């Protein structure tokens, strides 16, 4: 599946992916990709205030994960002359139009390590905001699965799914860990083998998920068939060529990932326009630098922007947003 590049604010089919007699016309006309690329470049130049990883943590990590400790040491070397680590990201780097962070970055590490290195200036702290259950709910919105949308508005989706008779014995984390592979198209036998559970048990879970997400399955399958028929798939800001050799599961999941990227771009533009100090984006999360004296107002303002961004893409439906971490520079405190 080939990405169709974006230039400024018009996304075209690219002639080098096309037959000589194919009529090429613009698929998408809007300024969002251009505005996002500009905002993203501005965010990257600001960077994130960090301190080096301490030696005891490096030694402990070295015993567990040598690849991770190499990343940590690379970051330490970059912080020798400057306590501000700039991010290097590439907009529209994937076929779904998502941005990819390249090279040493805070995004290279799991969140449990962030408190070891984040070091905001006095009077400031970093706040991580995150869209809740983004991919399942995007799928539900694409499929007009109103029952799932209603559950999401009122309660935690994964907790609510435990009410199903065949999922009642599972905790929230287990259900979350099953749902995403299911939505991505993983088969029950593959899941059973990967997690070392009986095939009959995995099949029972998959049947339960199919009962809950049958409208989603139908819609994603329909979009996938249409993409193979038309030879391309598109969202608000991006498009990709689909060929008979394209991976079916990737094509099926493309609208969900691409819609998430559409939302992120509008959220970034909205945060920058609102004067919120956004320092880093990671998939569907946003790291903000906020004055402690204005913490509540800034967070509330940012959450409003993120909800509005999702509504612009999901026909008025707002994704829930949570505070997923607060980092004030104290080591080990999230």
Give the ranges of each region predicted by the language model.
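Short, solvent-exposed polar/charged micro-motifs at secondary-structure junctions
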Residues: 136-138, 289-291, 329-334
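Hydrophobic alpha-helical membrane-insertion segments
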Residues: 139-141, 194, 293
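Catalytic palm subdomain of template-directed nucleic-acid polymerases
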Residues: 190-191, 287-303
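Short alpha-helix boundary/capping elements
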Residues: 146, 183-187, 290
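Extended, well-ordered alpha-helical scaffold/bundle regions in very large, multi-domain proteins
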Residues: 2-64, 185-213
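C-terminal, non-catalytic extensions of nucleic-acid polymerases
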Residues: 95-96, 299-334
